[in-house]
């Protein structure tokens, strides 16, 4: 077999890479990070939270009254195992049934599961009640044999997670349940609306970061760490170590530490002495590992001099205790207080237990060491925006913090109940003790409103954590499930956190971010990125101890200054002598899945550190592993080979084998062919861009001269870097750096970058089919395109976004041409004949909801057809279309302000109703009218009951929206435009074959925007329409314009897509040739019918009597400050007076000529008076804006007299 054949067979082709990507998406959905995180919460975290607070103890001390039964008792309640069942609902009559998601949506219920916990109570008696507290011996008096299962609340369930009814259900069964098989889940249903939890980005805890402070600050450098326990509360204790700047009086730069609960900064030498490291030499050893590093030792000089006075552990503790929050206590207590703070609050992530002072001292020394390295300029200060130092809190951690808070609240209530029972000698009932609605309502409140945390302290909570799931287009739904948010103030003009960072490569989409104030703060995950759910660190620590880790207690820095420090989740565990071997071993264990695949192993050779992370919220992405075993004959090639790809393809369609045995994505990971790397570990590896590049580089290493034949049309590729000797990983495909919406863009690599960002925003507003079950859903609003088409120019990624199955647009024939001038400034001309044949026609659904509410115990509202004789306050729309039950029949045509749900509420007997009420009027009208601007046909009426068993209706209305002048359209390249004119078929230009374009856009839209991909897409679509194959417009592939042109030429067309066209009016040949071809266009949701608005007269605000604002309230158009300034600059004073006064809030005021204040006037009787002046004759009439009159009267109420004096103009 010659070398050529071998090479051909072995190098992975692009096609093979896509096979691997397909296997990835077959195994996991696009909402996987949401589902994994929620499953971890339900299966592990919830039980851990219960175990953390598992015992309630109440001691009842003997009263020493000598009476019988006067003994010291201890009551204990234990929480044990928790149980979560499938989602259920309790009807108003008390029956319990299984709940399905569709039912929850339609009946406005919450899709949640009941949570039970084993509770066990125990009463113990002290053997002798005269012993001091804390030394009693307890004898069990009574104990429950069996723990009782108690209902403690309902947990909302994420759709398609392990506990959801739809989990593992086949497509045909989904149809029976009225669910769409394309729906990915990953959201909750709260009160009938779909809520998604947006991932919250935060800085990682437990990592040391060093920053340089700007010039005027008294601090030169600061090292900070925010500690949090590995699991347990989010109570973060932060600590800083500051290197003071050189000031004039004392030239030395001292180092101080900020300790929690201590008011002033403490010199670090004192902190070391308080931790029990007393001699100067020992302190220096903790900080400076190399005794010959005189520069660093010199930096420490001022610190040691500063703390020279304090030479003893107790004195150091006292020094710290004196600066604590407690004052005027005994020395004994101060020492205890300082000791407790050092034990529990200083670096709590290392441990909060007794006897670990050595570890804390070493860690403190490490922090100072890091800071001094920066100060000596041997190391760069840290980068705040490094993505490896960020964590994403998904549904799991967010719900966990909420659940922990609510569970504690509930146990406090149980404790109070227990106290009450013990005091009053009542029987203690576990079911009564637990208030189950604390957890139920707490979780529901946070998910429903997005205010994360306690309902009572809603000001301090995070807002917008949960949002209503965007159901406009299928792609917008997917994108919403993968969105992340950075909670820093939107108004801050900080540019740094918003910028794209190198470490974002492959983790978040570079194009998909909103424009405006949230730009760069709201991000979207890339297609293949994965968020770690967290795994316990104990097994790794155990393994390290077996593999020769020297603990800090035995570590002598001066003896081995070159040992590598080992950190696990930010905790310095010890040092190791052979880091290379250790790293290699850990990696091979991870590739065999002996330790979790999401653990990251970062070996920093220069700083001599090995950092391991197992925590939740790190963002990782998969990469091919390159074989780097020195003994292997395939060194420098990918571990994954053709036979693996072959096996993937074979097993893909085999349904007869068990899913566990199938060779899929998981098998690739467990066979060590692919591994997940996070942003931190990515910096320690070398990644080739594609298997071809890897192969080219390998041949270069082997000494083959690769002669490139120069093709001028070929895509320019950088030559392989001769200095790279070994690659460790290889990208699966560079197209995977994009997110959901950017993956829909054809050739995004040929566009100017902001254009891709604009399209990513507009793709969310395109009409299409958002789900296949839209007929059975009652969404508030929905737009469905009549004839959606799959695009002719597709990307490979669309396969996984189901864009072919649920597209959002149509392939229109587009000519780029100036024609008549009705397509200037981004407007487009559309062919009326195409519109009449159904191009871009869409249907619009809107749902109106109402229910009979209870008012008090007995009285309730009622659906009926209101009658004018017995009902007050009836609306002015027509009630004729209602049936007797107060609802409208499906199929009825309705227009603005018709009543579609008739409902009345009883009037209490004592209400006067502004004197309109007579004996007959017993009810008032609370009906729902159609929106004033809409019209259509009633599509569906649903009558059901809600949770309380009250009658509840939803009425869905539909109307057809036909494209018309003013509607907005866009191609997939940020080229948006509105229809400027529709021409009849006979007025449009036509080509030699008689092809008439559907859309004509202006050539001026192309040059300045540089959307070359728009033109390439048009050309490629033309080829694929002629050849009958989909055109592949995936980014970063070798498709060139030249290749497409050749194909177009072979079909007998001009190679660049130009065609001769004839003028529609005259039939003459157009002078220039016209670029003509199919382009995929999207109809956006901004329709002129929903925006058109004008007003002559209408409602005014009560307070200022100026017109109200807003189209829905029939408001006026604001004539603002800038408009006013223009009129002033033109000198049009009468126009100004008319706009701002006559047409707004003109008002007639009578003013007393003596005092200049507003007088009492009765226009009917023609009598005026000013009582303070006893004036009845001398008045002036003034016209004022009502707002000015209001201002004057408000000033009068504050004892300021605005006096209006008038002149008589003869």
Swiss-Prot record:
Database matches in PROSITE patterns: RNA_POL_BETA
Zinc finger feature spans (C4-type): 1152-1173
Subcellular location: Nucleus
Single GO BP term: transcription initiation at RNA polymerase II promoter
Keywords on record: DNA-directed RNA polymerase, Magnesium, Metal-binding, Nucleotidyltransferase, Nucleus, Transcription, Transferase, Zinc, Zinc-finger
Top-level EC class: transferase
Disulfide pattern: none
Positions of Mg(2+) binding: 826
Main location per the UniProt record: nucleus
Coiled-coil portions: none
Pfam family, one: RNA_pol_Rpb2_3
E.C. number: 2.7.7.6
Highest taxon of source: Eukaryota
InterPro entries hit by this protein: DNA-dir_RNA_pol_su2, DNA-dir_RNAP_su2_dom, DNA-dir_RNAP_su2_hyb_sf, RNA_pol_bsu_CS, RNA_pol_bsu_protrusion, RNA_pol_Rpb2_2, RNA_pol_Rpb2_2_sf, RNA_pol_Rpb2_3
Subunit details: Component of the RNA polymerase II (Pol II) complex consisting of 12 subunits.
Main function: DNA-dependent RNA polymerase catalyzes the transcription of DNA into RNA using the four ribonucleoside triphosphates as substrates. Second largest component of RNA polymerase II which synthesizes mRNA precursors and many functional non-coding RNAs. Proposed to contribute to the polymerase catalytic activity and forms the polymerase active center together with the largest subunit. Pol II is the central component of the basal RNA polymerase II transcription machinery. It is composed of mobile elements that move relative to each other.
Name by which UniProt lists this protein: DNA-directed RNA polymerase II subunit RPB2
Species this protein is from: Schizosaccharomyces pombe (strain 972 / ATCC 24843) (Fission yeast)
């Amino acid at each position: 077999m010659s070398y050529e054949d071998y090479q051909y067979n072995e190098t992975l082709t692009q096609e093979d890479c896509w096979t691997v990507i397909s296997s990835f998406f077959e195994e996991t959905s696009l909402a996987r990070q949401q589902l994994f995180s929620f499953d971890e919460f339900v299966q592990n975290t919830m039980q851990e939270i219960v175990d953390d607070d598992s015992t309630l103890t109440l001691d009842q001390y003997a009263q020493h009254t000598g009476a019988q039964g006067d003994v010291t008792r201890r009551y204990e309640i234990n929480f044990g195992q928790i149980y979560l069942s499938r989602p259920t609902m309790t009807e108003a009559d008390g029956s319990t049934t299984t709940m399905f998601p569709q039912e929850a949506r339609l009946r406005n219920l919450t899709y949640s599961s009941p949570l039970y916990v084993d509770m066990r109570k125990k009463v113990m008696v002290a053997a002798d009640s005269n012993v001091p507290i804390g030394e009693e011996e307890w004898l069990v008096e009574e104990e429950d044999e069996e723990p009782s299962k108690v209902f403690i609340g309902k947990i909302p369930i994420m759709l398609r997670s392990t506990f959801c009814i739809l989990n593992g259900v086949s497509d045909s069964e989904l149809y029976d349940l009225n669910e769409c098989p394309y729906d990915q889940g990953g959201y909750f249903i709260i009160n009938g609306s779909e809520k998604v939890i947006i991932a919250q980005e935060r800085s990682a805890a437990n990592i040391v970061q060093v920053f340089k402070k700007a010039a005027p600050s008294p601090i030169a450098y600061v090292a900070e760490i925010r500690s949090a326990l590995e699991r347990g509360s989010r109570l973060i204790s932060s600590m800083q170590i500051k290197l003071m700047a050189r000031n004039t009086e004392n030239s030395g730069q001292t180092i101080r530490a900020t300790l929690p609960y201590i008011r002033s900064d403490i010199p670090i030498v004192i902190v070391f002495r308080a931790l029990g490291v007393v001699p100067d030499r020992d302190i220096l050893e903790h900080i400076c590992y190399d005794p010959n590093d005189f520069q660093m030792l010199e930096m420490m000089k001022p610190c040691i001099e500063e703390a020279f006075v304090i030479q003893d552990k107790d004195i150091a503790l006292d020094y710290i205790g004196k600066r604590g929050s407690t004052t005027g206590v005994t020395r004994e207590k101060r020492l205890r207080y300082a000791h407790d703070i050092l034990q529990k609050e200083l670096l709590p992530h290392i441990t909060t237990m007794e006897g670990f002072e050595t570890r804390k001292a070493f860690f403190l020394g490490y922090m100072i060491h890091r800071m001094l390295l920066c100060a000596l300029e041997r190391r760069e200060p840290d980068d705040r925006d490094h993505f490896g130092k960020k964590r994403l809190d998904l549904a799991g951690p967010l719900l966990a913090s909420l659940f922990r808070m609510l569970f504690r609240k509930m146990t406090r209530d149980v404790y109070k109940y227990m106290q009450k029972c013990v005091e009053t000698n009542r029987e203690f009932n576990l079911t009564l003790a637990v208030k189950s609605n604390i957890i139920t309502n707490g979780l529901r409140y946070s998910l429903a409103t997005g205010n994360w945390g306690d309902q009572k302290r809603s000001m301090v909570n995070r807002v917008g954590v949960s949002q209503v799931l965007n159901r406009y287009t299928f792609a917008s739904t997917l994108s919403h499930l993968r969105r992340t948010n950075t909670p820093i103030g939107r108004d801050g003009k900080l540019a740094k956190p918003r910028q794209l960072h190198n470490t974002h490569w492959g983790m978040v989409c570079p194009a998909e971010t909103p424009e405006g104030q949230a730009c760069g703060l709201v991000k979207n995950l890339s297609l293949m990125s994965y968020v770690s759910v967290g795994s316990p660190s104990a097994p790794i620590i155990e393994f390290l101890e077996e593999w020769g880790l020297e603990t800090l207690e035995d570590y002598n820095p001066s003896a081995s200054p070159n040992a590598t420090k080992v950190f696990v989740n930010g905790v310095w565990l010890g040092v190791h002598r052979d880091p290379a071997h250790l790293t290699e071993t850990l990696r091979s264990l991870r590739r065999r899945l002996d330790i979790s695949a999401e653990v990251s192993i970062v070996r920093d050779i220069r700083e001599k550190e090995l950092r391991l992370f197992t925590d939740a919220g790190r963002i990782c992405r998969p990469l091919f592993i390159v074989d780097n075993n020195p003994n292997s004959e395939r060194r420098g090639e990918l571990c994954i080979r053709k036979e693996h790809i072959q096996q993937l393809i074979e097993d893909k369609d085999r349904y007869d084998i068990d899913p566990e045995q199938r060779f899929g994505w998981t098998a690739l990971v467990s066979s060590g062919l692919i591994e997940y790397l996070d942003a931190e570990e990515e910096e320690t590896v070398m990644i080739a861009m594609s298997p071809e590049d890897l192969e080219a580089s390998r041949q270069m290493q082997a000494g083959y001269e690769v002669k490139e034949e120069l093709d001028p049309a070929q895509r320019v590729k950088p030559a392989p870097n001769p200095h790279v000797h070994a690659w460790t990983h290889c990208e699966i495909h560079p197209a995977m750096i994009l997110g959901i919406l950017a993956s829909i863009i054809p050739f995004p690599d040929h566009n100017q970058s902001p254009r891709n960002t604009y399209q990513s925003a507009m793709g969310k507003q395109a009409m299409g089919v958002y789900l296949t079950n839209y007929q059975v859903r009652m969404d508030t609003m929905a737009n469905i395109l009549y004839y959606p088409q799959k695009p002719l120019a597709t990307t490979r990624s669309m396969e996984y976004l189901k864009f072919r199955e649920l597209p959002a647009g149509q392939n229109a024939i587009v000519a780029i041409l100036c024609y008549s001038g009705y397509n200037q400034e981004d407007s487009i001309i559309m062919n009326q004949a195409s519109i009449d044949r159904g191009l871009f026609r869409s249907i619009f659904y809107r749902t109106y909801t109402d229910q009979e509410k209870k008012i008090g115990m007995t009285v309730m509202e009622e659906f009926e057809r209101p009658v004018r004789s017995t009902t007050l306050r009836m609306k002015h729309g027509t009630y004729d279309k209602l049936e007797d039950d107060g609802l409208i029949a499906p199929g009825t045509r309705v227009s603005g302000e018709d009543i579609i749900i008739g409902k009345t509420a009883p009037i209490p007997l004592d209400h006067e109703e502004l004197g309109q009420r007579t004996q007959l009027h017993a009810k008032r009208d609370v009906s729902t009218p159609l929106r004033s601007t809409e019209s259509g046909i009633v599509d569906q009426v649903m009558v059901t009951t809600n949770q309380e068993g009250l009658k509840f209706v939803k009425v869905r209305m539909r109307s057809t929206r036909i494209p018309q002048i003013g509607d907005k359209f866009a191609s997939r390249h940020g080229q948006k435009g509105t229809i400027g004119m529709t021409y009849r078929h006979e007025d449009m230009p036509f080509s030699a074959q008689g092809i008439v374009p559907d859309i004509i856009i202006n050539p001026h839209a192309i040059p300045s925007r540089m959307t070359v991909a728009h033109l390439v897409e048009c050309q490629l679509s033309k080829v694929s329409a002629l050849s009958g194959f989909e055109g592949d417009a995936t980014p970063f592939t070798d498709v060139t314009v030249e290749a497409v042109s050749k194909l177009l030429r072979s079909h007998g067309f001009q190679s660049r897509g130009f065609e001769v066209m004839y003028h529609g009016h005259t039939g003459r040949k157009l002078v220039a040739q016209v670029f003509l071809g199919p382009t995929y266009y999207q109809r956006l949701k901004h329709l002129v019918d929903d925006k058109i608005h004008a007003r002559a007269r209408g409602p005014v605000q009560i307070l200022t009597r100026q017109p109200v604002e807003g189209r829905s309230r029939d408001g006026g158009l604001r004539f603002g400050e800038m408009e006013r300034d223009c009129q002033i600059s033109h000198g049009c004073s009468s126009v100004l007076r008319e706009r701002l006064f006559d047409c707004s809030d003109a008002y007639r005021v009578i003013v007393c000529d003596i005092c200049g204040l507003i007088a009492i006037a009765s226009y009917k009787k023609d009598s005026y008076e000013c009582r303070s002046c006893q004036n009845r004759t001398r008045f002036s009439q003034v016209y004022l804006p009502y707002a000015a009159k209001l201002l004057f009267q408000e000033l009068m109420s504050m004892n300021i007299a605005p006096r209006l004096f008038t002149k008589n103009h003869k």
